[in-house]
Design a protein with these regions (language model features):
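The conserved 3'-phosphoadenosine-5'-phosphosulfate
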Residues: 49-64, 161, 165-278, 282, ...
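PAPS-dependent sulfotransferase catalytic domain
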Residues: 1-169, 261-263, 269-273, 279-308
């Protein structure tokens, strides 16, 4: 009989190194909240120690992102406003996936989010910008948003898209088929082995790992509500991943609203690629081309500067 202290998936080691990390690299308004929800659940079930880094001030107590990872024994990193110079400090052997979105849709999504729904309690700089957006027309508001979100576009432009240890993805592809997308991600990270046969004991530990984090969430600190042991595991059973993805469908997160149905007050406003065409004007097209036209080509959303509203 397999004991919980010796359980493993076939052909997989349960040893987890806290040197090299597994990471999600994102950018503001590129489905970072949705991806974080799923990726964090994956790490919970695997019993991995994770950390979410949103802003430079979350790194600044340390000399670099690598120093933070080492000091806090981070195994899974969620870096939602990723900057390449910090990523390049991470230990050799780290692997991650990087998600970008059509910058024009980023702009529109940021405009509506910053005007209506994005929390500002931990982002006080948003408040004066939100007040400004309330006074502007849609066209002028989008122009103002282009200035406010400049760093988001700059980070995407500065990124190194040829890193062999980073899987590059378009948000539009990932949201269109989350099952295929996250299976690809999990395989790239070494977290998924479709050929493995998982023992009952292994599956029990997967559930215990999740309960461990649930206990700490309910009662933070050294004495959790549910004192359940956590054990880092190598791979995630495919049906567990499927369950995680099912719980994160757009209609479940929006109370039954279908993708494409707009609610400007919701964090999950619409979920439709190409929505920028419904909000840009010819003047905004010209403005965006002048500022970030090269970025669209760099990311593969356009092949030249001749694009327009049609």
């Amino acid at each position: 009989m397999t004991s919980l202290s010796t359980l493993q998936a076939p052909s997989q080691s349960t040893n987890v190194s806290y040197g090299a990390v597994r990471a999600f690299y994102g950018h503001h308004k590129c489905a970072t909240g949705w991806i974080t929800r799923i990726f964090r659940e994956m790490s919970f079930h695997l019993g991995r120690r994770h950390a979410i880094v949103h802003l430079p001030r979350h790194i600044s107590p340390y000399a670099s992102l690598a120093d933070k990872v080492s000091a806090e024994s981070i195994d899974v990193l969620i870096y939602t406003n990723a900057q390449i110079h910090e990523v390049q400090t991470l230990p050799e052997g780290s692997r991650g996936f990087h998600v970008v979105r059509d910058p024009r849709d980023v702009l529109v999504s940021a405009y509506f989010s910053h005007k209506h729904s994005h929390p500002s309690d931990k982002w006080p700089e948003l408040e004066p910008h939100r007040d400004l957006l309330q006074t502007l027309s849609l066209e002028d508001g989008l122009a103002a948003e282009m200035v406010f979100s400049q760093s988001v576009f700059a980070d995407m432009q500065a990124w190194d898209y040829k890193q062999p240890n980073v899987l590059e993805l378009h948000m539009e592809t990932l949201t269109a088929d989350p099952d295929a997308g996250f299976q690809r991600i999990a395989t790239f990270l070494g977290w998924l082995d479709p050929e493995a046969l998982y023992s009952f004991a292994y599956r029990v530990q997967v559930r215990l790992n999740r309960l461990h984090y649930l206990g700490h969430a309910r009662v933070p600190g050294p004495y959790p509500l549910l004192p359940v042991p956590r054990r880092p595991l190598a791979t995630l059973p495919p049906d567990t991943l499927a369950h995680i993805l099912e719980a994160s469908r757009f209609n479940r997160l929006t109370g039954g609203r279908s993708r494409g149905e707009e609610d400007v007050q919701s964090h999950y406003r619409k979920g439709t690629p190409g929505d920028w065409r419904n909000h840009f004007t010819p003047a905004l097209v010209d403005h965006f081309k002048a500022e970030w036209g090269d970025l669209l080509i760099q990311l593969g959303y356009e092949t030249d500067h001749t694009w327009g509203l049609i």
